[in-house]
């Protein structure tokens, strides 16, 4: 049972919802976050492969839902839609329906962090497989059972492994290399890199990499129906969560910590040490907002947007922050 409901230290078993180690496959599995809302988004887990000889994830595809694969340690040889490439720390691979994909660890203790939407991976697939394998030997492996099971869970089945075909990373549109965004916006104390756009999540959310300098802060001092999920990749962020009208919980989040904020929960974060944070569930139209802000700046290169006008833009594009700034710049 985790001590802090808003913080998951990904290396601490007590902070995980579930952990298991399979000696046969050499995979250490950790479940960090259950799916939320009717679209079942934000399920987040990790597969750690003990050695390069551990059983790889075979080539397969899904008929619905999305999977986002992110490496936090080690290296993988991946195939997506027939093209092979390497997935390294900081990289992101976003898989949509009918995209064949596979993963083979090539370094010991390689970690593959996976975020799901619309699939119900653990409770609908992993837990069912564990229970049937333990209590009803042979049932899960039965071909007739598999025909029904994989269809119900959006698994369109395993595919023949592609012919060897290693390509340059830029030729794989589903791959987002570390430090590179689909679109990029630099505002001095914070640089935003769009990693996954709304058109890739059926309009549900965007995923952003935030590169922030010490003193940058953002405040959501309101009660909005939003789930928020942040993964600290490096640096340190200080968080303040209002737990009642008179009480707050404060804590620091560092590398390989996730910050989990449920709906109707006022919170704030402030950067303590230069940080790289991945916003895994941005429901705002943040790309649209940045385009608007950039257009205004181009027309007014020597001016600073009025605060009331800026927050009006925020609300127009569903970015619900109540305060934002940088202590270095605010002086």
Enumerate the predicted regions with their spans.
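A generic "binding-loop/recognition-motif" signal
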Residues: 53, 64, 83, 99-100, ...
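A short beta-loop-beta micro-motif enriched in histidine and acidic residues
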Residues: 35-45, 53-68, 197-206, 214-231, ...
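Short beta-strand His + acidic residue motifs that chelate non-heme Fe in jelly-roll/DSBH
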Residues: 57-59, 78-79, 95, 100-107, ...
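Short acidic-glycine-tyrosine-enriched beta hairpin
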Residues: 68, 82-98, 229, 243-264
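A cytosolic small-molecule/anion-sensing beta-strand core signal
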Residues: 72-73, 89, 233-234, 273
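A short, N-terminal "cap"/entry segment at the start of jelly-roll beta-barrel domains
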Residues: 1-43, 58, 133-206, 219, ...
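Double-stranded beta-helix
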Residues: 49, 102-165, 272-331
């Amino acid at each position: 049972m985790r001590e802090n409901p808003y913080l998951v230290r990904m290396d601490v078993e007590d902070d995980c919802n579930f952990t298991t180690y399979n000696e046969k496959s050499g995979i250490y599995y950790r479940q960090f976050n259950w799916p939320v809302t009717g679209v079942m988004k934000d399920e987040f887990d990790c597969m750690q492969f003990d050695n390069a000889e551990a059983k790889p994830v075979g080539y397969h595809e899904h008929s619905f839902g999305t999977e986002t694969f992110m490496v936090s340690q080690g290296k993988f040889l991946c195939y997506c839609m027939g093209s092979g490439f390497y997935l390294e720390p900081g990289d992101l691979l976003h898989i949509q329906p009918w995209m064949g994909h596979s993963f083979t660890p090539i370094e010991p203790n390689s970690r593959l962090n996976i975020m799901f939407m619309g699939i119900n991976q653990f409770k609908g697939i992993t837990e069912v497989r564990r229970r049937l394998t333990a209590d009803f030997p042979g049932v899960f492996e039965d071909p007739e059972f598999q025909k029904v099971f994989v269809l119900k869970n959006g698994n369109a089945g395993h595919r023949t492994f592609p012919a060897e075909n290693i390509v340059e990373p830029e030729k794989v549109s589903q791959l987002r290399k570390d430090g590179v965004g689909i679109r990029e916006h630099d505002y001095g104390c914070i640089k935003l890199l769009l990693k996954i756009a709304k058109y890739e999540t059926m309009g549900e959310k965007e995923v952003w990499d935030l590169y922030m300098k010490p003193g940058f802060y953002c405040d959501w001092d309101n009660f909005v129906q939003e789930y928020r999920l942040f993964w600290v990749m490096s640096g340190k962020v200080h968080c303040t969560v209002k737990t009642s009208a008179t009480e707050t919980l404060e804590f620091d989040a560092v590398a390989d910590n996730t910050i989990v904020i449920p709906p109707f929960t006022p919170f704030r974060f402030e950067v303590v040490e230069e940080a790289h944070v991945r916003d895994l569930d941005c429901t705002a139209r943040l790309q649209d907002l940045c385009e608007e802000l950039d257009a205004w700046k181009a027309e007014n290169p020597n001016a600073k947007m009025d605060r009331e006008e800026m927050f009006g833009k925020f609300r127009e594009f569903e970015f619900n922050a109540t305060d934002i700034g940088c202590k270095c710049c605010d002086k």
